[in-house]
């Protein structure tokens, strides 16, 4: 992605720094952050984002069974209540970014503190930006052989 942004290096640098900060800081588990990022990519039909975040999730120990039930997170036993709340917020805000439905907001508050909620919302927002930018730039995932 950052190669595609080479015509504007400052944008590439600031975006990379922001994504790194979201990934490396805070108290929301890395697994949850990656599931949220993956869900955003999936909802926005961003092949590039989905591929990248599937690989990261797998590297964090998320198994294929969990990834295959992401679309059914609300009922799948593969996800904790906290993950379900974060994923419900992801779906709600990716589809309708103006406000969280009260039930989704309540689920977030039942599972996360205020700082963690800000973290989750920032991850949702950043990944929506990245997926839309990636789609607009026409980015596609590289074949696995090219990434090795």
Residue ranges and their predicted role:
Residues 1-148:
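Hydrophobic alpha-helical segments
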């Amino acid at each position: 992605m950052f190669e595609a942004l080479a015509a504007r290096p400052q944008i590439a640098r600031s975006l990379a720094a922001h994504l790194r900060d979201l990934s490396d800081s805070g108290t929301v588990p890395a697994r949850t952050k990656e599931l949220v990022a993956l869900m955003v990519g999936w909802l926005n039909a961003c092949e590039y984002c989905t591929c990248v975040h599937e690989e990261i999730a797998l590297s964090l120990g998320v198994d294929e069974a969990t990834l295959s039930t992401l679309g059914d997170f609300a009922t799948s036993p593969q996800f904790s209540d906290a993950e379900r709340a974060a994923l419900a917020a992801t779906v709600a805000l990716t589809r309708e970014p103006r406000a969280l439905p009260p039930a989704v907001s309540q689920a977030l508050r039942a599972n996360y503190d205020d700082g963690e909620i800000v973290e989750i919302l920032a991850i949702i927002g950043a990944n929506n930006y990245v997926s839309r930018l990636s789609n607009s730039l026409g980015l596609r995932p590289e074949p696995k052989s090219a990434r090795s």
